[in-house]
Amino acid sequence: MTITPQEALQRTIEHREIFHDEMLHLMRLIMRGDLSPVMAAAIITGLRVKKETIGEIAAAATVMREFANHVEVQDNSNFVDIVGTGGDGSHTFNISTASMFVTAAAGAKVAKHGNRGVSSKSGSADVLEALGVNIDLQSEQVAASIAETGMGFMFAPNHHPAMKNIAAVRRELGVRTIFNILGPLTNPAGAPNQLMGVFHPDLVGIQVRVMQRLGAQHVLVVYGKDGMDEVSLGAATLVGELRDGKVHEYEIHPEDFGLQMVSNRTLKVENADESRTMLLGALDNQPGVAREIVTLNAGTALYAANIAESIADGIQLAREAIASGKARAKVDELVRFTQQFKR
């Protein structure tokens, strides 16, 4: 039975769940632009206030995937997405983007799904443009990029055109809503493995269980206890791991992997150019915190991609990819490949 928008709003006011099929229906109304801005704003605010359930988030992600422009990838093995919800307020350089180059250099295929900076000084799209990558690719071109270079960047506005129907509402509300956590759940290439950073500790257990419902294979959802939506060097990191259909939650520390715990303060940047400089420094094997945090995150991604048997093994592979120059070479390879499609 379908639910009316008014009934859904009443449900959120009473802190009651909107069931799966009802949420599918509501989300389709939003994505088609069939809800008034007032009603759309009220419902997504009501969901936030009552706290979205795993079922509601999974249903919303299912619809967002339905409406996406998909990237068809032939070979799903060792295929991973490295993504963060953003919104952690840390203003660090683009660690997950740097990790993409290292992860690909070590043999994984990476489909990175990202956007321009909203809360951050430099989103993944901003730093890739600063590096010379053409981010404005069609779906078939992204698929070719993944096949050829082991990396593909999916610029979110190109793949989620229906999001324009809620964009003005989100902008005017100016608060976090369910849409802030849907991005990492809706990779247009359908990567079955993922390293996902989140901005709040409660999201670790929630997002990993959403991915479980969505049929993912190997996922690590991470939250650095210093507030980072990455595996952190400055504190312990909470991990929710989905593997073989089962979820395990645990904590990891830099010292577990022979790394020193150091503050992430030196990783802050003011703009995409500063992020580019720090990213290239890490990939050029310059000793320092930037290289170490990229090694740690790429190592975790290699474990998620099933290239490495453990995070520790992944870190070793990441170190070798950087030291050999292969990771740095991946930057030039992606720039060269994507520039041929410049319009």
UniProtKB/Swiss-Prot annotation:
BP terms from Gene Ontology:
L-tryptophan biosynthetic process
Q: From which domain of life does this come?
A: Bacteria
InterPro entries, sorted: Anthranilate_Pribosyl_Tfrase, Glycosyl_Trfase_fam3, Glycosyl_Trfase_fam3_N_dom, Glycosyl_Trfase_fam3_N_dom_sf, Nuc_phospho_transferase
Name the GO cellular-component terms: cytosol
State the Gene Ontology terms under molecular function: anthranilate phosphoribosyltransferase activity; magnesium ion binding
Per UniProt, the keywords (alphabetical) are: Amino-acid biosynthesis, Aromatic amino acid biosynthesis, Glycosyltransferase, Magnesium, Metal-binding, Transferase, Tryptophan biosynthesis
The record, for SUPFAM superfamilies, names: Nucleoside phosphorylase/phosphoribosyltransferase catalytic domain, Nucleoside phosphorylase/phosphoribosyltransferase N-terminal domain
Its Enzyme Commission number(s) read: 2.4.2.18
Recorded protein name is: Anthranilate phosphoribosyltransferase
Q: What is the originating organism of this protein? A: Burkholderia cenocepacia (strain HI2424)
Its organism's taxonomic lineage begins at: Bacteria, Pseudomonadati, Pseudomonadota, Betaproteobacteria, Burkholderiales
